[in-house]
Amino acid sequence: MIDENFQRSQLWQQLKADFPEWYQTNIEEAARIVSAGTEADMSKHLIVQLVELRRKNAEHALAADTSKLINVAQSFLANLKSLASHSAATCYSFIGQGESSPAVIELFPQRGYGEAIEAQIAAIFEAVSDGRKSPVSRVRATKSDYDVLAAELTKLGWSKADLRVFADPKALAQTEHEKVCKMVQDWFSAHLAISDAAVQERLLFETLRPIVAG
């Protein structure tokens, strides 16, 4: 029954096709947890396992076609906006802890929030699948690439002081949660607004690394 329910989801269809043994093991464990506990316990278990699988396959995701990387960035931004609509604290916890954040785990099974969380995870595993089949080698972003990104951020109202704060982990940690959440949304919006495809590709390769590997 759990397998039937999960196969209505694009994410779980992808995982069953690409990681059949992992899928079977975790579906069986999810069924056991639900019978002995709660849906919240099952969600926590699945998130933990998904994060572990994502980290193991990070290099495959980063080797995907650029269209897949753009999709990851778009889905990450959509998820940030969704979580921010719940609260700045939830958005901030996601930025710091990823899907393993207790706040995110709590929202994962909830309508209105779970869809965006799942879509972001699904986008990463679509990239993993693509990168495993047809890996792409990429070069690192250059200073001139980051100058292009800074110009896009300036269009969004960023000052030089904002750029310095965002580049300084200590300063960012002292910034209001709501502003940090907005800045990270701007960061991804700016990447997606870059018109030079080669520049955008190099920057996404750098920016998405902590998203898929962290």
Where are these regions (language model features)?
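Acidic-enriched, low-complexity/disordered segments with a strong bias for Aspartate over Glutamate
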Residues: 3, 18, 41, 65, ...
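Arginine residue identity/basic-tract feature
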Residues: 8, 16, 32, 54-55, ...
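A cross-kingdom marker for long, charged
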Residues: 158-214
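Aliphatic-rich, non-membrane protein domains
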Residues: 2-5, 9-17, 62-67, 115-125, ...
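N-terminal Sec/ER secretory leader and immediately downstream segment
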Residues: 1-99
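Extended amphipathic alpha-helical interaction segments
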Residues: 82-170
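Alpha-helix capping and helix-coil boundary motifs
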Residues: 35-46, 65-66, 87, 138-141, ...
